[in-house]
Amino acid sequence: LFPGFLFTRLDADTAAGKGAHQKLLTEFGRQDSHVLLGTKMIAKGLDFPRVTVAGVVDADSGMYYPDFRAVEESFALLMQVAGRSGRGTTSGRVFVQTFNPNHYCLRLLEQHDYCGFYSIESRLRRKLSYPPFGGLATLCFRGKDQHKVLEAAEATGVLCGANPAVTVLGPVAEVPARQKGIYRYQLTLKAPNRKVLQVVLGELRARITEVCSSGARWYIILE
């Protein structure tokens, strides 16, 4: 694709050794290679005046990740990537690969419109009762036996859903659904505010042994 070009790869694997991260950046900085190819770790904090082109592959995977903060985090990350290009005397260009170029995140990114993004994102969160306009908790379930993990998540959802002020979403498999032999499921609890959630979670802790067998462990992420 780029004949004659040399690449520097920077990710968790290549930067694992002591001093490897800085060594790779130093090599790229003195132009031992033409292209720096890496994961999110190359998005911010790097200053190479001769870099004039930045590219993002499959930006949709970040924007559509199953998390209410996904679009916000993607916008911030893409803005950081854009800042890596054109830091010297030559102007830079940024290419973003997407199947949805009309997504508001990308349109506002193109315009560098922070205020416009905040306006749309906050309006959506208010409508859906997501933080900071509502309470949200994620219950994560782990275990080697998929049936027991899913069963515990489903039973917990039924128990929490008994409170009419709480909306239960899921359970659903996480991404990835299985990691190092451990199955991963989660369910989300939505409520008008954190106080309601704290009451429900307090009741859940008192009764967790009723729904969570020894084959599954769990923890809470309170937004």
Please name every model-derived segment.
Residues 1-65, 71, 80-223:
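Accessory helical-bundle/CTD segments and flexible terminal tails appended to RecA-like ATPase motors
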